[in-house]
């Protein structure tokens, strides 16, 4: 019986996530970007990531969209050009291209792994591995990915931490802070998932 009730509530949460990701499409012309990236090749993919996914789970207003893709920045640029989507190179060396549709900006960042860090900036190597990308993120709730239909990839149980009001580093907190000292500020300024 408990399992049945638990499945009901999990289903309800999943349905809510799907509804909220569809609501994003009503407020943001993001589907055009998903289609552009997916048109690059049969293997290319794109997901919502970070703050926008966290806000969906916390029932907060999504005011900016961060996206992650398994194609490199040059391939992102080719995909956007091919689909007549305006863009600028926000931080191409770090993998970020900003697409612009209807005066709305969407940061698209290629999957990556850190090869060296200096306490603030990292040298990165682009990757096609979603888990590897998640491992370089700061907190578990920022390593949740969602496709356009609301299906979730959550390798570090960030959703559970959100539900429990926890802010949890991925990996060793001391090491993560040494990689990027800004993370200590983010730790103390991260909104509580229970606010």
Model feature map: region roles:
Residues 1-190:
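Catalytic cores of the polymerase beta-like nucleotidyltransferase superfamily
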Residues 191-195:
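A short, hydrophobic C-terminal helix/tail in secreted or cell-surface proteins
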């Amino acid at each position: 019986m408990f399992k049945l009730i638990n499945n009901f509530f999990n289903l309800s949460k999943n349905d809510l996530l799907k509804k909220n990701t569809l609501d994003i499409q009503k407020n943001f012309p993001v589907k055009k970007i998903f289609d552009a990236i997916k048109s690059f090749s049969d293997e290319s993919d794109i997901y919502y990531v970070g703050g926008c996914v966290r806000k969906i789970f916390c029932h907060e207003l999504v005011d900016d969209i961060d996206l992650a893709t398994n194609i490199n920045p040059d391939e992102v640029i080719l995909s956007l050009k091919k689909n007549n989507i305006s863009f600028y190179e926000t931080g191409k060396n770090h993998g970020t291209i900003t697409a612009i549709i209807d005066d709305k900006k969407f940061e698209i960042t290629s999957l990556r792994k850190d090869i060296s860090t200096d306490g603030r900036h990292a040298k990165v190597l682009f990757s096609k591995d979603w888990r590897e990308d998640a491992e370089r993120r700061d907190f578990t709730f920022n390593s949740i990915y969602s496709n356009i239909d609301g299906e979730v990839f959550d390798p570090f149980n960030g959703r559970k931490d959100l539900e429990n009001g926890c802010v949890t580093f991925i990996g060793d907190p001391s090491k993560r802070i040494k990689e990027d000292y800004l993370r200590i500020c983010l730790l103390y300024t991260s909104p509580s998932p229970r606010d």
